[in-house]
Amino acid sequence: MRKRIGVYKSALRLLGDMAPVVQTIAVVAPDRHHPKIQENAIQDCWQVLLEWLERFSFKREPQTEVILVPDEGNPLTVRKLARRRRRFAYAPSAFPGGSSQKVPFPRLVEDPLHRNSRDSYFLQWADFVANAAFRTVIPRADLPPNLWGELGDAALAAANGQRPRNEPPGVIVWPDRRM
């Protein structure tokens, strides 16, 4: 087990060495039955991630395009959410009684390109990152407590924005724990 953890940490550190070319964010839902989760945890996490990617691609200088390459877990759900977000996304008003704004995601280039993670080192790395984020939010006794920290500068702290300060940089805990 120790050797595997060492290899795992080395893979995460290698991503950290590639920063700022490689940047990582993660959305973790520690409680699937939280009252703030509107549909199901997987859909809500994808929705939060797509919202964040839309803002990131729009505000970045120069503006950048986004291509989603998820694993084969939920292809229909992810495709449906991405298509809806690309054309019809809305942002609610920040003020009571205000009107919502249309905020489409035109920088999402194509439908998600689903791949089997067994066939892609890129997606295996994404699985490592997702597991590191999950285990940082929900630790396990037999694993090191802060695997996410191994990513170093690759963990995109800007993802947290105005979110609670107790979240690790680049990890969005959804729904947040302020409720």
Each model region followed by its residue ranges:
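Phosphate-ester processing/binding pockets and catalytic centers
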Residues: 1-179
